[in-house]
Structures are given as C-alpha cells and as structure tokens.
Amino acid sequence: MTENRYELNKNLAQMLKGGVIMDVQNPEQARIAEAAGAAAVMALERIPADIRAAGGVSRMSDPKMIKEIQEAVSIPVMAKVRIGHFVEAQILEAIEIDYIDESEVLSPADDRFHVDKKEFQVPFVCGAKDLGEALRRIAEGASMIRTKGEPGTGDIVQAVRHMRMMNQEIRRIQNLREDELYVAAKDLQVPVELVQYVHEHGKLPVVNFAAGGVATPADAALMMQLGAEGVFVGSGIFKSGDPVKRASAIVKAVTNFRNPQILAQISEDLGEAMVGINENEIQILMAERGK
C-alpha cells in the first residue's frame, strides 16, 4: 500500500465518524440496521454473545453469507478476520469488502504477530485497550481503532476502562517535553513520528471508536462523551427484545449524545435489553488477545 492509499483509507474511516456500526448475521438484519441509520454493518455468522456461549474456535465468516449482505445494503460492509490470519484478509479483499476488522472476537491465528495491513488496499479496523496497542496497530497500517471492551457481555465497564486509559495516556504524552518523546516511543514500541503526532494533536492519528458491551442508548452516549468518535454495537441490538426500535435509538443517541432530554425520550419503551454478564462472573477471554 502506498502512502497516498493509506491516507485515503484513513479518510474513508473518517467518513464513519459520528456513526454506529452494527453486527448483522443476515441480509434482513442488515436492512434493519441500514433503515435505522447505521453508518456501516459488520457481517458475521455468530455475534460475540453466541461465540462466547458456544466456545471452540471461531473463524472468518462464510464469504457467500458476506456477499449476500453486501448485495442487500448500500452502506459499507465490514467483516472480521482472526488476528494474524493474512489469508482470511486476502479472501475478504478479493470479495471487495469495504473494511476488514482484525478482531480479538475471533480465535487468534497467530499469538505473536498481527496482519501486515500495509500489504492490503482495503482499510483495516483494530481493537486496542491502551495507547501502546493503538499506536502499534496504526504502525502496522490500521486505518481505524476501537476499544476492545469484552464483547458479548452487554457490560460497558471494560470499554469505559479502555477509553479512559487511552485518554489518560494521551494527556501524559502531551505533557512531555519534545526531547522526552523518543523514550516514550521506545517504551510504547512504536515509531517516534506517531508519538509526536499524539503530542501535537492530543488524539490518535486515526479515528477512534468504542466497542464492547454497548447495549443501550445511554451506553452509546456515555462512550461518545468519553471521547469516542463513533460506536460499534455487537450483541446489544439483535439480542434485545425490540431490535428495530433499539437500533434506531442507539443511532439517535450517538447523534445527540450531549442532549439528556433526547436521550431520556429515546430510552423509553425499548423492550428488554440483552441479558448482560457481569465481568466478575466470567473469565476475560477476548479483550486480552492481540497486544
């Protein structure tokens, strides 16, 4: 990938800013997401809650199923590959997917190395729970970062923790002297140019979304107020009592995240939220994958 192409990919990801990206399992769900105002959909055979419940090895979704979703909607379609599985990424690029998510939700294919994202033309999304992880993924060619949260739980606590951690570390970098940035880059194991960008601009060089545990409009607005530039919603919509209404409400919450009156209004009568799992009741499986 050329430098110009990478800049284009980062700009493509910027176009999703202020939007909601929803996990969908079939064309019908994709159409519901599009009608609700989703900025993009994530095509996958099993949503995180089902992956967690079933256990075993989880892999890239069937390309035929992804293509059916691509044909059903006009908004961008994303799909997940396993961490380090560059052949799954090659397959998704071959079917002209709009974005690839190198995701800790699936079972890692490589426990040491991530995909070299600069070998691809398509933009990549990656998860991160702190500034070091985020900048390492960006150094590999990621065009978009999201918090990891703990997918499939409906518990927002980890996404909040990751976003706050990233914000704190960004502020720490901003407070360093210019000549201290080289040591910071060494500690974070990233090129100094990325640390210099954070120092100067007070944010990541790419768009930063929230993901993991978003189940209500209030959750989505919370992440936006903490500094997220958009929200991924996985199990929270289609594991709820009224997916159509909840999808629309979460989109409105992201748009109006600083307006409590609107948030109160759209939070009414949504039906039952997905059954959540407290982080103290489970083993943290996914958020720790891929550092």
UniProtKB/Swiss-Prot annotation:
Which InterPro entries does this chain map to? Answer: Aldolase_TIM (IPR013785), PdxS/SNZ (IPR001852), PdxS/SNZ_N (IPR033755), RibuloseP-bd_barrel (IPR011060)
UniProt xrefs under CDD domains? pdxS
- The organism sits in which domain of life? Bacteria
Q: Which residues form the active site?
A: 80 (schiff-base intermediate with d-ribose 5-phosphate)
Query: Do the record's keywords include Transport?
Result: no
Q: Subunit composition?
A: In the presence of PdxT, forms a dodecamer of heterodimers.
Instruction: Provide the function of this protein.
Output: Catalyzes the formation of pyridoxal 5'-phosphate from ribose 5-phosphate (RBP), glyceraldehyde 3-phosphate (G3P) and ammonia. The ammonia is provided by the PdxT subunit. Can also use ribulose 5-phosphate and dihydroxyacetone phosphate as substrates, resulting from enzyme-catalyzed isomerization of RBP and G3P, respectively.
Name assigned to this protein = Pyridoxal 5'-phosphate synthase subunit PdxS
In its UniProt entry, the species of origin is given as Streptococcus pneumoniae (strain ATCC BAA-255 / R6)
